[in-house]
Amino acid sequence: MNTKARALGMNDTRFLDPAGLNDNGQSTVQDLVKLVVYATRYKNIWQLLQEKEFTITSEDGAITHNIENTNQLLGVIPNISGGKTGYTDLALGTMILIVDIPGHRDTIISIILGSKDRFGDTRKLVDWITDAYHWE
């Protein structure tokens, strides 16, 4: 993961486990934006991040997992194209949210770190951006 991060230009990120739960791992907002831009290339995965619930089935059909998305903003903020939530006791709440701008090829990438109210803070930030800026 760290090799891939460097290849993406994520020079201030250090992964210590795939889940990101090790408190000694670190990243920056700038590096997370690079990761989000890269991840959006994988539409089949990104599409799942828009769903409140979905089922994943093994290739042989023997195992299924029902997944509930923890993103409480799905269906609340319009035009969400994906997002990722996170929480650890040390990092507190984290949230990455990608919102498409209707009629334009632009997107808002909102990243909240160290929050006690990641969903509320994300909503405030996205609302402020959509109120403060106008796309032509």
Where would I find each of the regions flagged by the language model?
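Penicillin-recognizing serine hydrolase domain
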Residues: M1-E136
